[in-house]
Each structure stands twice: as structure tokens, then as C-alpha cells.
């Protein structure tokens, strides 16, 4: 499928992980690729791709997944739902191209990109094993969740665009629904990603053990070989 993208890193041998990055409104995949450069050295066997939004935005070089003109709490979910099949198809495309399954796929988004990665797991549970949502939110809070995906919310404490309250509400909803979630608040940070945000993200991918591993251990089971994500 044809879509705007920027390959940050492509390993010489078959990829062991897939990291897909999604930018905010008006940005582009090359710019978001700078974030990918933080992940690439720590995951040398990963295919790292920054994916552009499906449609142009007001900025001549910018892209978006859905328009924010006239957006409200009442119509946001419908706009997300309208483009979601294309978003999921894009993730599936890169999984097929890389030969990497959902168990070793991480979706990383900022702002509108974070909305899309969060909503994609709501629409297609198990699409990826990890989600990192920088300064994002759900269009509407999830009522169900599973531990198949570990969700890491990283949010600026002073975000004037997407209020921190949305991240707190998302964490509470996911916990209530039985999901696997972490929330890190970056003090004094607005609607942006800084070094502290990145350190939270890198540490989670390397060191945070998914909750379902503990659940399987407590039940006397163990993860299958195809259910182990080498992100840690």
C-alpha cells in the first residue's frame, strides 16, 4: 500500500522488532523520525518506521489522520472511526513487510498520533504488544481492555492542548477494565516530548515486564515462544 513514511532504521538481517511512529497534526514523518533516532540504537534489530498521516493538513508539508477543524467531544470518535481501517491496514502492512508479528510490534505516537495508536488497540485488540502515547488521549474512554497490549502513557504536566486529566482518566479506565497500563507525568512540560519523556519511553520498552507474564506465572502457565516480545 502507498503511504507517506520515513524509514529510520532497517537492519541488515530480518527484523526482530517493529517500531512504528505516528506524528501529530501538521507534522510529517521525517520530523517524527527524529524521535525514532532515540529508539534505533537501543533496538538495533528493529525496523523503525515513521508513518505519515493519511491526508494533508493545512501546513503544506504537514499530514494528519483526521481534521481537527470544528472538532468536538461529540464528533471526535466518528472522525477517528472513519480513518481507523486505513490506520490498522498500515500497521498490518509493516508487520507483513518486516515479518514481525503483533507480539514484537510497538506503536509510538505523539498528540494525534497518540490518539490513533490508543484507539487502534481499542478497535483491534492485540494489534501490537506495546503502545507508547506521548501527550495523547482516547476519543472516548475504553470500556474493555486486555493485557495483550501494555500501554505506556507519558504526558506533560502542563499540557495546554491535551490536558493531563485525559491521561489520568485513560489510566483509570484501563485499570478498571483489567488492562495493563503505566502513566508517567513529566513535570512542567507542555504539549511536547523532551529528554525526560524519552527516558520514560526507553526504560519502559527495555525494562517493564508486561502484566500478562505475571498473570500466566500465577496461573501456572508460561508464555509460548511466539508470545515473547524482545523489547526488554
Swiss-Prot record:
Keywords: Hydrolase, Serine esterase
Pfam families according to UniProt: Abhydrolase_2
Stretches that traverse the bilayer: none
Active site: 111, 159, 191
SUPFAM superfamilies referenced in this protein's UniProt entry, alphabetically: alpha/beta-Hydrolases (SSF53474)
InterPro entries, per database record: AB_hydrolase_fold, LYPA1-2/EST-like, PLipase/COase/thioEstase
Enzyme's top EC category: hydrolase
GO terms, molecular function: carboxylesterase activity; hydrolase activity, acting on ester bonds
tRNA processing listed as a keyword: no
Keyword Secreted belongs to the record: no
EC number: 3.1.-.-
Family: Belongs to the AB hydrolase superfamily. AB hydrolase 2 family.
Function: Displays esterase activity toward palmitoyl-CoA and pNP-butyrate.
Name of the protein: Esterase YpfH
Encoding gene per record: ypfH
